[in-house]
Amino acid sequence: MTQDLHLLLTSNGFDNFQNCEVFNQNQANTLYNKGTESISRNLYGAIKVKKIEVISELFQLANKLATNGQTKIVFYPISTGNNWGYGTSLPNLSSGNSVILDLSLLNNIDMVNEYLGLVRIEPGVTQGQLSGYFEKNNLPFMVPVTGAGASCSILANALERGYGITPHQDHFAALTDLKAILPNGQHYQSPLSQLSSEAGQADLVNQTYKWNVGPYLDGLFTQSGLGVVYQATIRLKRIPAGFDSFYIDYKNDDDVRVAIEFIKSTLEKFEGIVGSINLMDRLRIISMLKPNPNKDTGNLLSSEQIETITKKEMVAAWTIVGSIYGEPSVVKQVKKLIKKAAKPHAHHIIFSGDVKIKIAKSVFGKMPAWFLPAIQDKLKSLAASIEIMRGRPNEIAKPLCYWRTTVPEQQSAIKDPAKDKCGLLWYAPLIPMSPDSVIRYTQHVRTVCRKHNIDPLITFTNLRHDLIDSTVPILFSQSSELSVSNAHSCLDELVKEGISLGYIPYRLNIEQQLRWFDGHLQSDQIMQKIYKAFDENGINQIGRYGK
């Protein structure tokens, strides 16, 4: 395509430039052609939307061009473009006609009903913005945080069916209502929303009942290319009166069996009181506490290095991290029961509300950095993890992205791993909740990762007593062709072999979507017919999860 985007829009009657900003090819590639994945794409342009109405106008124009046999453009919406490890701000395809539709300026927040805890947001609303909104307006709610940090979109994570560690851990489950624009220009709203509006009733009941009436269609807008969601209502969790977090260490690697049994039992007994529980292996904890000593060489951590760091930093083979929410008396009683259940097998059990932890924070907070640094590092990590569990976004997980990169880490408060050329891909399969499955899976990850010179860093996020999602960061150096090749080969083998073993990813990056949604899935075949009905000209998100 030789004609620049601005000229293409102008020559075809588009004139709403006061409500959007247009970037031509060079500008767009500079701003958006970046990522942690080392995936190559070529952009035709980008449009930063300031008003929702622009989306419909652009879809109308794109359909006109395609129908007349003129230049075809395909839009790829992003919320903030910080989908690190899955595609960042890149389109699924690189066909020369890809246009980024940047929705980051659509960032209105409307407290629909404080009494019920319902807030309406747009795609550009970040964890940090919502946190600031709550603080400014003295609203007693928790932000549905993720480890990605303050600069990431809340709505985008929900539409990717992501999750966090606060009580409303399933972020799409907490999304009660949405509005979208389809590629043919048609607007979508739920049946409850439309019926309430037509009856002249307050637009509220549809925002409290997720499942609507009749066929449930809202879910078709998640992990799909059906349309552009421009508004959604989410159910918030009020800050509880009581809170405590627990950290349980297991000394030996084979203690993972009793750790999983403890987690299943705890989530089953205390559903709604205990949030999701994370189980992390030794290497994952090391990556949070210390810089990579082999960053310059690109080598795996040796057994000797792991042993040295383990002793110096007091790192266990497995560490459980969880939280308790509720009335103070309830939290106190559940804490006793958790301690009793964990004690027979655990090496250490720590609760953030323990007096000794409070004293340690007070004492070490006044000490110089050189005084017992291992303890100080652990206390800092503890404090940051507590903030996350209380629904306050922070950057505790970001240093992980810099584990293999040789580019100096940003000193700014909010880091951008893509800008810093960090190498990160995610492997995120679902695992059956059973000790045997977890043990087999752990061996699978460690074997494949080491084969490709990748440090195997394993986290199990236990969302319910019957569900585990594992997240494994594939960390590499983008400045090394060999490191990039190893990372992609590693992820490909993890996914392919993992599926054969029953470990199916719940989320895929933009390359994997093309590979695994190749038309053979029955659900994919049904979605193609739906896409054909509403996007006959293929102007929106081609390649996204099989479209």
Model-derived regions, located:
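Short amphipathic alpha-helices in soluble, non-transmembrane regions
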Residues: L5-L9, L58-A62, F262-K264, G322, ...
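General beta-strand structural signal in soluble alpha/beta enzymes
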Residues: E21-Q25, K48, V74-S79, L101-L103, ...
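Conserved glycine-rich FAD pyrophosphate-binding loop
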Residues: T36-Y44, L65-V74, I78-T80, G85-S98, ...
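Short beta-strand-to-loop capping motifs
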Residues: K50, I248-D254, V321-V330, Y427-P435, ...
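Short, conserved charged micro-motifs
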Residues: V54-E57, Q129, D253-I260, P328-L337, ...
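Glycine-/small-residue-rich beta-strand-loop submotif within the FAD-binding core of flavoenzymes
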Residues: L90-T126, I165-P167, L236-K237
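FAD-binding subdomain of flavoenzyme oxidoreductases
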Residues: P123, G128, G132-S265, K269
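C-terminal cap/substrate-recognition region of VAO/PCMH-type FAD-linked oxidoreductases
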Residues: L204, D218, T233-I234, D244-D255, ...
